[in-house]
């Protein structure tokens, strides 16, 4: 009894087969069908190969939200070379609340302003990359995905001993400031505290020594990430006057970067540059120096590196294989039909299958005509 029930169940399942098998004796192979099959398998292999590279690739997803962190400190990473002696210049930060930030984290190093041949080559390469970034903004995704892998963004050390005197000052290091708008500036004289803010001892420096030609090797905010280029990296300005004033208006955007290699809380920024000559007689007032006025955006950007799921990769592969099979089968039938029409195998009113012709002959030979029956 159990065997009968099992046999009935198998027969029932067999009747539900949506993929009936055709015996090989009923299958006819042709050269055209083999050619189409070969082309189909080649196309499937190529598309599957390219799809594998799409599966391996990643992309950056950008999300925006309100920055709720107001208590933490903002780190400023600085590496600037000014064409003046270190004893003549001073750098400090004054925020929106008129709070002077101590510049103890900055190092003043006497250097030669002109770069060595190897350093100049590095600087030209950096400027070339910056130019491409300004033209092709999508390249920033490439930098995000390749952090910690690119060449170092710091100026390489001088490979030769300078013969000329140390006529410049390299100011490098980092500062921690409040997350409010502020002004980082480099001007004549060392900074001293003042009840109403701060002041610089500029009276002790000769006016003829003023030269605020400078080169920004690196300027970033937040955690410093090797391999990431910032908008002002590689900027070089040459002062044409002793009373030159350089201004940089910076908008900082907090950024959380999460890739498969690094997770960091950093900051991106955009900058607008302006420079002018201080001439009180002509109404152009101000102080000679380098001024970087920054403001912090209230929005935060989350940059996340994403990858195609494996199940989606399998679904796309199945779609490629099934789509090519169906398409090539339809095209093969369509081409075969067109060839038959061109070869005049199907002529309206003329072509008849052989079996039908034989059947008509048998009818004509065995069945008498009506006229013959009438005569008889």
From Swiss-Prot:
Organism (species): Danio rerio (Zebrafish)
InterPro entries in UniProt: Erv (IPR045888), Erv_C (IPR012936), Erv_N (IPR039542)
Cell compartment(s), UniProt: Endoplasmic reticulum-Golgi intermediate compartment membrane; Golgi apparatus, cis-Golgi network membrane; Endoplasmic reticulum membrane
Entry's Gene Ontology cellular component terms: COPII-coated ER to Golgi transport vesicle; endoplasmic reticulum; endoplasmic reticulum membrane; endoplasmic reticulum-Golgi intermediate compartment membrane; Golgi apparatus; membrane
Membrane-spanning intervals of the chain: 34-54, 319-339
Lumenal compartment segments: 55-318
Family: Belongs to the ERGIC family.
Main location: endoplasmic reticulum
Endoplasmic reticulum is among the record's keywords: yes
Name of the protein this chain belongs to: Endoplasmic reticulum-Golgi intermediate compartment protein 2
Keywords: Endoplasmic reticulum, ER-Golgi transport, Golgi apparatus, Membrane, Transmembrane, Transmembrane helix, Transport
UniProt entry tagged with the keyword ATP-binding: no
Primary role: Possible role in transport between endoplasmic reticulum and Golgi.
GO biological process, one term: endoplasmic reticulum to Golgi vesicle-mediated transport
Pfam families named in the record: COPIIcoated_ERV (PF07970), ERGIC_N (PF13850)
UniProt topological domain (Cytoplasmic) ranges: 1-33, 340-376
Membrane topology of the entry: Multi-pass membrane protein
